[in-house]
């Protein structure tokens, strides 16, 4: 079977930053590189997602910038889903924001991987039959699409860069760079930083 890890961001001490910060959130961000997929779960707060989800957008931004600079998307071949609790109007907007962000980072969103639950809080969500059915759909589809992506490995043939940032410059010395370079070289992708390596 598949394994998953639940990370509760409110229990972590972390900085809300667009920089590569070494704090309690950093190891979990690094784990995304080794995972087959990720789910963002958030309640609706005044029609929007939580501040913790916004912090994830910000903290993953350096990876997005690195991907543009190096013409390599490290999150290709990985799947993405969302869970929004609290019900009512607004969940479509939250899914949309999350999916827009995820696809720009290279994630694939399988069908039926958007969960809406009127229940709030883990204790209530696990008792809600409708929510549990959506969770089953999401889990099966994410697992299936992750397997298909891993076996097909579209990363090697896909286009990795849509923006020419060569004239923009910017910081690219991130702590995750070496790991991503190794992955890129493994699929035969030549990035700016690994261009001198034998790929």
Model-predicted segments: where are they?
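Short, glycine-/small-residue-rich phosphate/pyrophosphate-handling segment
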Residues: 70-115, 130-133
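Amphipathic, soluble alpha/beta structural segments
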Residues: 89-93, 117-119, 162-167
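Flexible, glycine-rich phosphate/dinucleotide-binding loops
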Residues: 13-15, 89, 121
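A short small-residue
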Residues: 115-125
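N-terminal beta1-alpha1-beta2 submodule of the flavodoxin-like/Rossmannoid cofactor-binding fold
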Residues: 1-70, 125-199
């Amino acid at each position: 079977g598949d394994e998953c890890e639940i990370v509760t961001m409110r229990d972590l001490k972390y900085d809300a930053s667009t920089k590569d910060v070494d704090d309690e959130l950093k190891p979990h961000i690094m784990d995304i590189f080794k995972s087959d997929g990720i789910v963002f779960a958030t309640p609706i707060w005044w029609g929007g997602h939580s501040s913790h989800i916004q912090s994830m957008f910000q903290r993953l931004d350096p990876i997005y910038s690195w991907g543009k600079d190096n013409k390599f998307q490290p999150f290709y071949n990985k799947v993405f889903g969302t869970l929004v609790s609290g019900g009512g109007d607004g969940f479509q907007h939250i899914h949309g924001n999350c999916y827009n962000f995820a696809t720009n980072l290279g994630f694939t969103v399988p069908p039926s991987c958007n969960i809406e639950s009127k229940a709030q809080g883990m204790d209530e969500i696990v008792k809600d039959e409708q929510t549990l059915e959506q969770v089953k759909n999401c889990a099966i589809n994410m697992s299936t699409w992750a397997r298909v992506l891993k076996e097909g490995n579209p990363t090697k043939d896909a286009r990795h860069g849509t923006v020419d940032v060569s004239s923009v410059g910017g910081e690219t010395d991130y702590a995750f760079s070496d790991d991503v370079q190794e992955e890129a070289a493994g699929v035969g992708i030549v990035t700016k930083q690994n261009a001198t390596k034998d790929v």
